[in-house]
């Protein structure tokens, strides 16, 4: 399994399984001198961790991160940063009944066919539990981006099932368990999730993440375009089935006269492109949306097969999120931060001294 690392100059490698002893990450390429502590990482981990509300899995993991290396006297040294989170609330017995069958809609079948075996406890390596380390590593990138470049990254749930945010209040995002920016829809969300829980079912969601104050020039055409790497990062998150940059699939119904982001001496007149032109950041807000499927771990009976190919029926046991999109918000923020951090370092390496007389637009 070679796909455990992400990034080039700012590179993150993760390890660990859902019900293993621990999860870990090695972060390479962080510039020296950045003030960082476990508390800086813990904030985002607390936003992602399970058991924080009745709308997420009841598995209770403190997700307390330990910095093992790469930080001395409160500052990064420029060497590899080692991170570790211990698993403390595994209930592997919940999965003993399904070790010989495949959960439909999960990675059980494909992992088994590819590797000839699989860790059936909570999905093993394929579990979203692994994303805790991405969030921890992303918190390092987020602090550097904000402290050195003033870049702010904000994620939120823009849609849960049929309920869409029709208003945007940034102050609301961290004030409710849905990371939802529209206070007028919170009661409807609560009732919808209550009904869903009674059904024993799950639902999909849409998450949006915005990066502000991104400098113009990030992105390495043609194969490492900024939007291509962002899409790669977001599609690497569990349950993500679609990614949009800017207006995304809505451009199908737009005319060129409508879609083009006209330029004036005062700046861009619109941002249909989502802050990226020709694979390079334009200096506008980078706007990314992703669609997450409903988890197949539900108590509604479903058809499947055993490892021997025999037909059977199953009801999922264990502790699961009825909407995985809720806890995906800090994960999406982290992945966008990792991409921007990597591209900032790559841009600096090749284009540090490039100057133009053209004004930079916003």
From Swiss-Prot:
Pathway linked to the protein: Metabolic intermediate biosynthesis; chorismate biosynthesis; chorismate from D-erythrose 4-phosphate and phosphoenolpyruvate: step 7/7
UniProt cross-references to PANTHER family, sorted A to Z: CHORISMATE SYNTHASE (PTHR21085:SF0)
GO molecular function, one term: FMN binding
Source organism phylogeny: Bacteria, Pseudomonadati, Pseudomonadota, Gammaproteobacteria, Aeromonadales
Record-listed FMN binding positions: 125-127, 238-239, 278, 293-297, 319
GO CC annotations, alphabetized: cytosol
Region (Disordered): 39-59
GO biological process: amino acid biosynthetic process; aromatic amino acid family biosynthetic process; chorismate biosynthetic process
UniProt EC number: 4.2.3.5
Assigned protein family: Belongs to the chorismate synthase family.
Record's cofactor remark: Reduced FMN (FMNH(2)).
Protein name: Chorismate synthase
Cofactor requirement: FMNH2
Protein's organism: Aeromonas hydrophila subsp. hydrophila (strain ATCC 7966 / DSM 30187 / BCRC 13018 / CCUG 14551 / JCM 1027 / KCTC 2358 / NCIMB 9240 / NCTC 8049)
InterPro entries: Chorismate_synth, Chorismate_synth_AroC_sf, Chorismate_synthase_CS
General function of this protein: This reaction introduces a second double bond into the aromatic ring system.
Record bears the keyword Nucleotide-binding: no
Keyword entries, A-Z: Amino-acid biosynthesis, Aromatic amino acid biosynthesis, FAD, Flavoprotein, FMN, Lyase, NADP
